[in-house]
Amino acid sequence: MKFSLAFSPCPNDTFIFDALVNQKIDTQGISFEVFLEDVQTLNEWAIQGKMDFSKISYGVWNKVHHQYRLLNSGGALGKGVGPLLITKPGTINSPENYTQEAINQMTIAIPGENTTAHLLFSLAYPNATKKVFKVFHEIENAVLNGEVDAGVIIHENRFTYESRGLEKIIDLGAYWEETQQLPIPLGGIIAKKTIDPTIIQQVDALINESIKYAFANYPTVAPYVIEHAQEMSEDVMRQHINLYVNNFSLNLGSEGHAAVEKLTRI
């Protein structure tokens, strides 16, 4: 049996799916046609019902749950893993002046409209409306060249923004943790409801096995991860994996499900 499967080229996703899609584990007769795209594209495809299995932002879950089931394995949740709002030093005279009113007047780059990052930003700044939606890896440059006043960054940009002379206004993930007392639900894996539930459970278990295989061979970074890592260093790849792949990736559990449910009620 062959199914379509979509996820991002980011190290956490390629780390999770490497063993599964490259047949490093026994996939029990199941194979995949793989599509790697940025998270906003994945979210749009999910709304269209395009993929059998896909990574999505939890921010879009309310728009797709009628046609997809959420898997327990393969997701990204945790503590200290949220998006950051960053800017150039001197945009406002001093960091303590980054008030709600000041942010409301700024043009903000967001990594996609239907993303968890956008949802978390809107939770912290509900009256900020000057938004520009961009692919996540374009946001640092948009801030640096003055196209926008500030930007919400995700993924590996958490590890690079300071080296490029940018500064943090707020950690949106920390804001979520402080206000909700739950881990940050960033993204999860979904399966079409039209697929046999037994097969969905089988794939869920295979993703779990794929993650365990990856960890058994870590900290060596697999060629599949390096191939799709967009010129980042192996140290940054490991930072990325260490931050985003954890026990919640193996199994959402009750705390993970509670976090997802809370996010989708906002």
Label the predicted regions.
Residues 31-33, 69, 129-132, 167-168:
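Conserved beta-strand segments of alpha/beta enzyme cores
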Residues 2-22, 36-37, 83-149, 156, ...:
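Bilobed "Venus flytrap"/periplasmic-binding protein-like clamshell domains
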Residues 70-97, 176-194:
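Hydrophobic/proline-rich hinge and linker segments of small-molecule sensing/allosteric domains
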Residues 27-41:
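A short beta-strand-loop structural module common to alpha/beta enzyme folds
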Residues 136-225:
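Pocket-lining segment of extracytoplasmic ligand-binding domains
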Residues 12, 38-40, 49-62, 135-136, ...:
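Beta->alpha turn/N-cap motifs
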Residues 196-265:
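Secondary-structure end/capping motifs
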Residues 42-54, 65-75:
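Short beta-strand-centered segments that line the small-molecule binding cleft or hinge
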